[in-house]
Amino acid sequence: MHARIIHYICGENHINVAILARRSKPIVALISDFDGTLSPGNMQEFGFIQAIGKKPQEFWQESDDIAVGQDASNILSYMKLMFDEARKAGIKLRREDFKRFGTSVELFDGVKEWFKMINEYGKSKGVKIEHYINSSGLAEMIEGTEIASEFKRIFACSFIYNKEGEAEWPGVAVDYTAKTQFLFKINKGILSVRDNKKGNESQAEDIKRIPFPHMIYFGDGETDVPCMKIVKMFGGNSIGVYNPENKKKINVAKKLLRQHRVNFIAPACYTYGSRMHQIVCTIIDKIKADFELTKLAKHI
């Protein structure tokens, strides 16, 4: 039945019914951390740290020292250190420079093919798939990776640039609690980091663009716990991702599952037929089935 006709005959309930009628298929959001989840290391370790003449362990220790010494944000501390060390090394930090470093970022097995594979599976089931990044890494570096175009929105740290195009100040700093705000933005279909007005407006659950039960969150560590917990608590699914070659990461994933922070854990292998592939496809099947049952229950 056409949405306008339903609008006419349904009286006080016309708004919600019309919206549901327009939703011929559910939208499923795959929301992923980046470092340790899609990539085997921190993105700064694939070119930038080497360019400033340091070793990864040395860089991160100096960043931690700033945070501890100043009782400051770990995120802002690493962003400041990038500024300071780049200046010492005579490296300009323009958006295109960050993107260039991003081209060297390594990805886990199957990641490059993952998006097309899952998109096609969703399409075959009558489900629209959307991919999002929710990371404490740098948006500009992620934009330089070969998978950047796969994401509807990259929520991550970023810089403010001067008239010469050089980074001069942190624009967005995303720590483990700040990550949670982006779940609610995705929930309401808000893509702007700056927009707080729409994010704080009350909105009925049945008109939100992507309900939490239609979210799948991927993360590798304890900094993802708030997001994992929120998605799981509101009916979505959280997957603890681990590098199968890293015993520490395996133990972290097992701990997350044991503490009921996640629904599933899986090695960071995104190839066809992998455990990750099986879990995600099965979740998509369930979301589609629940969507159809809800429509039947509302007699549409």
Regions found by a protein language model. Name each.
Residues 5-163, 256, 262:
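Alpha-helical substrate-recognition element adjacent to the catalytic core
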Residues 106-132, 136-300:
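C-terminal cap/substrate-recognition subdomain and adjoining C-terminal extension
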